Amino acid sequence: MSVKRRDHILIPKNPDAPLPSLKIEEVGECTIDNIYASPEPFVNGMTMKLSAVKNHGIERDSGEVELAGPMEKIFYNPETTKVAIVTCGGLCPGLNNVIRGLVLNLYNRYHVNNIFGLRWGYEGLVPELSEVQRLTPEIVSDIHQKGGSILGTSRGAQSPEVMAQFLIDNNFNILFTLGGDGTLRGANAINKELRRRKVPITVVGIPKTIDNDICYTDSTFGFQTAVGLSQEAINAVHSEAKSAKNGIGIVRLMGRDAGFIALYASLANGDANLVLIPEIDIPITQICEFVGKRIMSKGHVVIVVAEGALQNQKPKDLDLGTDKSGNILHWDSINYLRDSITKYLKSIGIEEHTIKFVDPSYMIRSAPCSAADAHFCMCLANAAVHVAMAGKTGLVICHHHNNFVSVPIDRTSYYIKRVNTDGPLYTMMTAIEKPK
């Protein structure tokens, strides 16, 4: 079905067409009384409506999703359940928090003792590459205080058939995958292979993207931490720019396809004069003219650049290919931006100027998460454990209107959530100077 995106919810282009199915698969009938989840109330397949959206000027519902919480009946017997956890892709604040949350909820609430981490991403599901680590409350007790992932990560696709067979051969019942869109596509492929074989193994995706660009979820863990730490970088280049004659400070922040971090950090900090994001392509001539006017009037300028900005201005014959996860490699536009600004300023007689550049990306993504993100991670892990024990599969745990919900993986992993440039977040940027 052809669909279009409204913020982070997918709806058909045709306003009269049926909505995409959001029904969650189950590996079998739940017959075991859930005596483990008390005192949380059972959700038992309760649903909530997604935000109403406008399509061709007509407001319509955008479907219902299942609440992710404890069920009165569960599918798996905790005494015999064996769980695998894998982390894939780039680092993100909160990975260890989610791992810890999964282990504590499985072990202390459902009394599941057989919990294992598969090291180095999806390589952990390939027999000749696999490194398996038992996880207990003692092992994960203080990992939330550290950045990174105790399981390690890797990029690159592996065979769904091989990974499904690994789970079967090693008697795993549940697989939790922590990762971004590429990881979720892999989880979807594993789940489809298991369903094809009619094997009752549950696959639950936990969305991990520091860029906050996964559909159907309002926010992802690590995002708030990234916004907070990004402000420190903006503060630094602001000080550098103000302390130099005709000073120009440039900060590059994460945001391969979406500019949420750049926008949130700039709005929160208040010192950015120009924000460049992938969703808006501002011609380099307008950028340079703005910088020139700002230098002449204020004596300095601060520019925040999302890493995916200015991609439409790269040389047409430049093809960088893709990374191991299949993501298109982006052109490094910073040198182009610096050279263009320098050339323009010299052309209008501003020979003396200084450009200072900061890229805090690796420092941010490898940092421990903030208190708000730590709380979010624990709640996310709690919801994931409940739906997994109930035999729900092929889903991602999303956060919508302060509720954790289950969304089919294929609805979240093949589309990218981007900044709505007609929405309130971007229009608030009108309070900040920008090119006309």
Swiss-Prot record:
It is an enzyme of class 2 (transferase). Pathway: Carbohydrate degradation; glycolysis; D-glyceraldehyde 3-phosphate and glycerone phosphate from D-glucose: step 3/4. One of its GO terms (molecular function) is 6-phosphofructokinase activity. It is found in: Cytoplasm. Catalyzes the phosphorylation of D-fructose 6-phosphate to fructose 1,6-bisphosphate by ATP, the first committing step of glycolysis. Belongs to the phosphofructokinase type A (PFKA) family. PPi-dependent PFK group II subfamily. Atypical ATP-dependent clade 'X' sub-subfamily. Keywords: Allosteric enzyme, ATP-binding, Cytoplasm, Glycolysis, Kinase, Magnesium, Metal-binding, Nucleotide-binding, Transferase. It catalyses: beta-D-fructose 6-phosphate + ATP = beta-D-fructose 1,6-bisphosphate + ADP + H(+). HAMAP family: Phosphofructokinase_II_X (MF_01981). The active site is at 211 (proton acceptor). NCBIfam families: PRK06830.1. InterPro entries: ATP_PFK, PFKA, Phosphofructokinase_dom, PKF_sf, PyroP-dep_PFK_TP0108. Optimum pH is 6-7. Pfam families: PFK. The record marks 182 as: Important for substrate specificity. Its main location: cytoplasm. Substrate binds at residues 209-211, 254-256, 307, 362-365. GO terms for cellular component: cytoplasm. Mg(2+) binds at residue 181. Activated by nucleoside triphosphates. Inhibited by phosphoenolpyruvate. EDTA and biphosphonates play the role of inhibitors of kinase activity. Its cofactor is Mg(2+). Homodimer. Aggregates to a homotetramer after activation by ATP. It comes from Entamoeba histolytica (strain ATCC 30459 / HM-1:IMSS / ABRM). GO terms for biological process: fructose 6-phosphate metabolic process. This is ATP-dependent 6-phosphofructokinase.
